[in-house]
């Protein structure tokens, strides 16, 4: 669906990832996993115009430790390598057995619980530092809750969200 101002979803305009690039992405993921000496299997698929790489296996807990720090770092690196100067291609998402979906649900629940605390105490509350993607999920969840507003604060990896009563 399009509107006068453009496509309803900006990713609708993006080109599908060519098969040879997808193979190269999977190979880079294999190389990273091998260098890290992790025992992980790698699958790839296109989902709703997004290139998804799934990593699974016995070393999955190492990949997801620290709120998915290694997984997030790998995803960042793979996107930098394969999308620099090629924004027409969709973002590359690295996941591990639906970790991203579970993490999003956790963040929405965190936003709901934190907003309840802010509303009850009528005092601001700062959350732990988060990645830009995680902060976006929390901001969107908080935007749907009446009586609170949110603001990102800090710099770099220490950037976090503070929730205020409206």
Predicted regions and their residues:
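RNA-contacting regions in translation and RNA-metabolism proteins
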Residues: 1-166
């Amino acid at each position: 669906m399009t509107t006068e101002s453009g496509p309803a979803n900006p990713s609708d305009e993006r080109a599908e990832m060519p098969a040879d690039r997808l193979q190269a992405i999977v190979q880079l993921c294999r190389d990273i996993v091998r260098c890290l000496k992790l025992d992980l299997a790698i699958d790839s698929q296109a989902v709703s115009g997004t290139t998804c790489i799934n990593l699974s296996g016995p070393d999955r807990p190492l990949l997801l430790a620290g709120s998915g720090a290694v997984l997030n770092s790998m995803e960042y690196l793979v996107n930098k390598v394969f999308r620099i100067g090629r924004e027409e291609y969709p973002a590359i998402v690295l996941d591990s057995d639906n970790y991203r979906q579970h993490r999003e649900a956790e963040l929405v629940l965190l936003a709901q619980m934190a907003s309840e605390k802010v509303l009850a105490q009528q005092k601001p509350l700062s959350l732990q530092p988060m990645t830009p993607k995680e902060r976006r999920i929390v901001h969107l969840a908080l935007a749907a809750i009446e009586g609170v507003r949110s603001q990102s604060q800090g710099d770099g990896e220490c950037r976090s969200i503070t929730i205020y009563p409206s």
